[in-house]
Amino acid sequence: MWWVRRTRYWFSTLLYAGGARLRPGRRTASGGLETPGSCGAELQGELDRFGGVSVHLSRHHTLHGLDAAAFRRLLQAAIQQWRSDGRIAAWLHIPILQSHFIAPAASLGFCFHHAKPHSSTLTLWLGEGPSRLPGYATHQVGVAGAVFDVSTRKVLVVQDRNKLKNMWKFPGGLSEPGEDIADTAVREVFEETGVKSEFRSLLSIRQQHRSPGAFGMSDMYLVCRLQPRSFTINFCQQECLKCEWIDLENLARTKHTTPITSRVARLLLYGLREGFDKIDLSMEELPAVYTGLFYKLYHRELPESYKAATGAD
């Protein structure tokens, strides 16, 4: 989809701009030649391949001690230069200890794009028409692990301590930045129950908009099928009220569970009876279009003959 492609482009831009540093004598976004100590004269930035410019205030040491009014004049001059140079957007990265620069930037049209623990990023669209810059992350990702033991036909479930209703559910939690889905499921299961497990497949994906647990944003909740590597329960009493191995058929029938847990339990029951190939989304690592990067692709099992087949076969 168009917004996915555009977001990929701009996020690659952010990653590039965040990792690169201008060296003495390199051409800058202002069009001048950067030399040590020149930052006080003009606000230097880094160009990206889409025609935008990124400015990291943490790299401008001469800004320390500068008042808001002086910074506004400096930024205003830079904006005029960027417009003259045909730049289409500006990204302003402000450390938390320089937050007094946010107000003058906002007075010149900058808006918040996103924030991290120690910095915020503001944007200004300089191109024609409405802004075409993508928003920041639209979803949070939660992952649960359905640890199912085929030999005993039991599945591991918990009851959350801080819920209004004591409903059985699969252990899980939020994925950490840069953490794979499978790793999140295994980690969360161990942290909540003390049971070690191994990833087998992805079973389901739930998307919920305006989620209260995601600060009103959208929430993605993925349930993975895991195979147990240990069976002794030592659950986290801060998070869980109960933790048990429950017969799968009983879990599929009970009313004391969440709708998604009930549905996944029935999915597991179907897989047990008819074959897990009917329900599993397997994972394979493939090379990304970005050099040196890889991604995980989840889909129904594809025969090896089709993996190697060409369009003419």
Swiss-Prot record:
Q: Which keywords accompany this UniProt record?
A: Cytoplasm, Hydrolase, Mitochondrion, Nucleus
Q: Name one Pfam family in it.
A: Nudix_hydro
Name all Nudix hydrolase domain ranges: 138-270
Any single GO CC term annotated in Swiss-Prot or TrEMBL for this entry: nucleus
The UniProt entry, under SUPFAM superfamilies, shows: Nudix
Q: Name one GO molecular function term.
A: hydrolase activity
> Which top class of enzyme applies to this chain?
hydrolase
Enzyme Commission identifier(s) = 3.6.1.-
Where in the cell? Cytoplasm; Nucleus; Mitochondrion
Q: Which InterPro entries match?
A: Nudix_hydrolase (IPR020476), NUDIX_hydrolase-like_dom_sf (IPR015797), Nudix_hydrolase6-like (IPR003293), NUDIX_hydrolase_CS (IPR020084), NUDIX_hydrolase_dom (IPR000086), Pre-Nudix (IPR040618)
Q: What else is known?
A: This protein is coded from a FGF2 (BFGF) gene antisense transcript.
Homology family: Belongs to the Nudix hydrolase family.
Q: How does it assemble?
A: Monomer and homodimer.
Name this protein carries in UniProt: Nucleoside diphosphate-linked moiety X motif 6
Q: Which organism is it from?
A: Mus musculus (Mouse)
